Amino acid sequence: MGQKVHPIGFRLGVIRSWDSKWYEEKNYAKWLHEDIKLREFVKEKLGQAGISRIEIERAANKVKINVHTARPGIVIGKRGAGIETIKKDLQGLTDNEVYLNVVEVRKAETDAQLVAENIATQLERRIAFRRAMKKSVQTALKFGAKGIRVACSGRLGGSEMARYEWYREGRVPLHTLRADIDYGFAEAKTTYGKIGCKVWIMRGEVLPQSAAARAPRTTGGARP
């Protein structure tokens, strides 16, 4: 039986980069667990800020955390007070000097993680799952997505038996490496159990840099 590989992991090193950018031999395990703690803390502290992804860069004794958010105002706070508080709390989780950078997500409607979280929030508010899914599909296409697939699984609508439902519009080629496919997952915690929400968004095609460099340049004129 065929299984679906993670679309982001499948494209790492081809058209997508890693979310943790550092190299270490001796302290690898320590830094890895540190990264997990830092990410969990930021997501917990800024749950309402619409966090898309968190990038962590390390160099010497410094840690740079790039928070991609749809609502940068919530993260920064009044006159930057919010960002300073979070930075101080993050400093307690690591021995290295912390730098916090906020990156605004311009189109939240075409960000898979934010779309998945939006669907999960609607399900928690008892909005009909089909309505929430269809609305997300239409909105993503309206804002320039080439294709989108949305799937929900669990006790949908409070039914006794769990099931899996999905909708797709446009192109979502999961095995085309040059296809820029974003993937997001969120869980809706409802009174009748958890419902998993998965979103795949095709944002277009990207030619890998290495392939672009190898491609021969075409010039006018006949061959010698």
Swiss-Prot record:
Pfam families in UniProt: KH_2, Ribosomal_S3_C
Gene3D superfamilies, alphabetized: 3.30.300.20, Ribosomal protein S3, C-terminal domain
GO molecular function: mRNA binding; rRNA binding; structural constituent of ribosome
HAMAP family cross-referenced by the UniProt entry: Ribosomal_uS3_B (MF_01309_B)
InterPro entries: KH_dom, KH_dom-like_a/b, KH_dom_type_2, KH_sf_prok-type, Ribosomal_S3_C_sf, Ribosomal_uS3_bac-typ, Ribosomal_uS3_C, Ribosomal_uS3_CS
Similarity annotation: Belongs to the universal ribosomal protein uS3 family.
PROSITE patterns membership: KH_TYPE_2, RIBOSOMAL_S3
Domain KH type-2: 38-106
GO biological process terms on file: translation
Swiss-Prot/TrEMBL keywords: Ribonucleoprotein, Ribosomal protein, RNA-binding, rRNA-binding
Record text on subunit structure and interactions: Part of the 30S ribosomal subunit. Forms a tight complex with proteins S10 and S14.
GO CC term (a single one): cytosolic small ribosomal subunit
Keyword Cytoplasm carried by entry: no
Annotated protein name in UniProt: Small ribosomal subunit protein uS3
Keyword Ribonucleoprotein among record annotations: yes
Function per UniProt: Binds the lower part of the 30S subunit head. Binds mRNA in the 70S ribosome, positioning it for translation.
